[in-house]
């Protein structure tokens, strides 16, 4: 009988992995490890806890859903660890996602290093010495490959998941990310210089650039609400056209002397807490960036700022919806696409494992 139960447990382990993915598989393995009896009651409870019964045991889509669940789990594992090690990383990953998708769609073009045939986007004005989190995305990519070697997931997908997980980690809210994006085989340095919104842009310019991507003024304000977390670097803030003049005296950057090159200033006074303080500051003329305070100059944007200041639920809902919309911005027509083996370069005939290890170990 004991031998039969052991065999049954092994069979259930493989069935569970194929049909329900990570959750049932891990529960089954725990039962085996702890030498629990695999009874009909135990199996029924396990299936119910993972919603397998609602999927239908015979549906072929169960395997795909399980695979995708494992992908999401593998990415979240890396993202959460990175944020736990450095809270600033959450805002950095959201910004990395935004700066990628806003230039020619979500194609991971921003992740590409310069090559002999093109200049990447990382040294464009809005990105240079600013965007970060590349190593986290590379590590998440490797974790997916390790845990799901037969699952091909693009760097663009991983970046989209990482941004969602960062939002979830800080806000406690979430939204759905679908898979299926592909990675560009080139980057657009010129596009990064012209399409991204800078901290010195007036309201008209901001609205024009967001409208070009299909976003209205309210959606723009919701997305800019991500400034509720994160920091700005002193070298940027010491550029007079980038900062709200009312905030100059609050900085500790030594802008009149030798600028504190490594100094950071919170985008709002609570830069590691997802709250409504950003909107309160904008209403009170205390937004850090020039572009932040411009939001009060339009009827629609002014109303949105005040609404989100007063209603966290509305802010979370609208931000999530705008992020879903952002994540679905398509690559430019005609751009060659692939699923990269390493996020920082286009595919070759093979990937040098030593080079891949070096890339994964390198700092941002």
Swiss-Prot record:
Residues with site note (Transition state stabilizer): 95
Binding site for heme b: 227
Domain of life: Eukaryota
GO CC terms in record: extracellular region
A GO biological-process term: response to oxidative stress
Cysteine disulfide partners in this protein: 101-106, 155-343, 234-255
Protein induction: By wounding and cold stress. Weakly induced by acclimation and strongly induced by chilling treatment.
Protein name (record): Anionic peroxidase
Prodomain positions: 21-66
GO molecular function, one term: heme binding
Organism: Ipomoea batatas
Recorded catalytic activity of this chain's protein: 2 a phenolic donor + H2O2 = 2 a phenolic radical donor + 2 H2O
CDD domains noted in UniProt: secretory_peroxidase
Secreted found in the keyword field: yes
């Amino acid at each position: 009988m004991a031998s039969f139960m052991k065999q049954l447990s092994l069979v259930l382990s493989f069935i569970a992995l194929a049909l329900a993915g990570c959750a049932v598989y891990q529960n089954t393995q725990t039962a085996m490890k702890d030498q629990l009896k695999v009874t009909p009651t135990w199996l029924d409870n396990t299936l119910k806890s993972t919603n397998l019964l609602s999927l239908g045991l015979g549906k072929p889509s169960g395997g795909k859903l399980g695979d995708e669940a494992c992908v999401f789990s593998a990415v979240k594992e890396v993202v959460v660890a990175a944020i736990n090690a450095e809270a600033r990383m959450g805002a950095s990953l959201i910004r990395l996602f935004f700066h990628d998708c806003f230039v020619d769609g979500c194609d991971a073009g921003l992740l590409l290093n310069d090559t002999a045939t093109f200049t990447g986007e990382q040294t464009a004005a809005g990105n240079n010495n600013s965007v970060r989190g590349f190593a986290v995305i590379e590590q998440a990519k490797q974790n997916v490959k390790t845990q799901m070697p037969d699952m091909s997931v693009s760097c663009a997908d991983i970046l989209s998941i990482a941004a969602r997980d960062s939002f979830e980690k800080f806000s406690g809210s979430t939204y759905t990310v679908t898979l299926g994006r592909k990675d560009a085989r080139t980057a657009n340095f010129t596009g990064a210089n012209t399409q991204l919104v800078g901290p010195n842009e007036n309201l008209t310019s901001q609205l024009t650039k967001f409208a070009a991507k299909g976003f209205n003024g309210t959606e723009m304000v919701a997305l800019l609400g991500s400034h509720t977390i994160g920091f700005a670097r002193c070298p940027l803030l010491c550029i007079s056209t980038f900062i709200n003049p009312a905030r100059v005296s609050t900085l500790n950057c030594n802008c009149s002397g030798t600028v504190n090159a490594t100094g950071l200033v919170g985008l709002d006074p609570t830069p590691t807490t997802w709250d409504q303080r950003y909107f309160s500051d904008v209403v009170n003329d205390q937004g850090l960036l020039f572009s932040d305070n411009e939001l009060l100059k339009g009827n629609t944007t002014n109303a949105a700022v005040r609404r989100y200041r007063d209603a966290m639920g509305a802010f979370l809902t609208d931000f999530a919806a705008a992020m879903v919309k952002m994540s679905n911005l398509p690559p430019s027509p005609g751009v060659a696409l692939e699923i990269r083996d390493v996020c920082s370069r286009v595919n070759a005939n093979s990937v040098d494992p030593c080079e891949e290890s070096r890339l994964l170990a390198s700092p941002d």
